[in-house]
């Protein structure tokens, strides 16, 4: 089975939904952020602080390039990975890209106590700008799911329904 890539802003539920979806489809779950943390031996926030965002984005690109040649994966991408046009096109060539679309208010509410999100340390106006910029690429996904006010299980069922229709 071809891969399923979950994209969306941080806090949209990609990892939570991805694990449930992979289990339902009997596919392997891959979390790009976790892969990077394992390979680098440090947390994402530490990579950002010590090596910078551009270094981290390059690590993301390398991971997605390594994965696209495999099959049978449900992949949780980092929020910035799916917002990169080249990465989006690469993922669409070899699978279904599912955008978990949530409002900025939902993101802020879900992540208000999360200290491990470097981008959330920026002023709210900067976060809003980033949110809007990323949506321009997320919109190119094959499937869009409104993930506001839904449980992870409800989101998974909606993804399964939409994938079956394709």
Curated annotation (Swiss-Prot):
Cofactor note: Binds 1 Mg(2+) ion per subunit.
Pfam family, one: SKI
Catalytic activity: shikimate + ATP = 3-phosphoshikimate + ADP + H(+)
UniProt keyword Iron-sulfur, yes or no: no
Pathway(s) the chain acts in: Metabolic intermediate biosynthesis; chorismate biosynthesis; chorismate from D-erythrose 4-phosphate and phosphoenolpyruvate: step 5/7
Localization per record: Cytoplasm
PROSITE patterns the record matches: SHIKIMATE_KINASE (PS01128)
Cofactor: Mg(2+)
The entry's keywords: Amino-acid biosynthesis, Aromatic amino acid biosynthesis, ATP-binding, Cytoplasm, Kinase, Magnesium, Metal-binding, Nucleotide-binding, Transferase
Coiled coil: none
EC number: 2.7.1.71
InterPro entries associated with the record: P-loop_NTPase (IPR027417), Shikimate/glucono_kinase (IPR031322), Shikimate_kinase/TSH1 (IPR000623), Shikimate_kinase_CS (IPR023000)
Binding site for Mg(2+): 15
Subunit structure comment from the entry: Monomer.
Task of the protein: Catalyzes the specific phosphorylation of the 3-hydroxyl group of shikimic acid using ATP as a cosubstrate.
Protein name: Shikimate kinase
Species of the source: Sulfurihydrogenibium sp. (strain YO3AOP1)
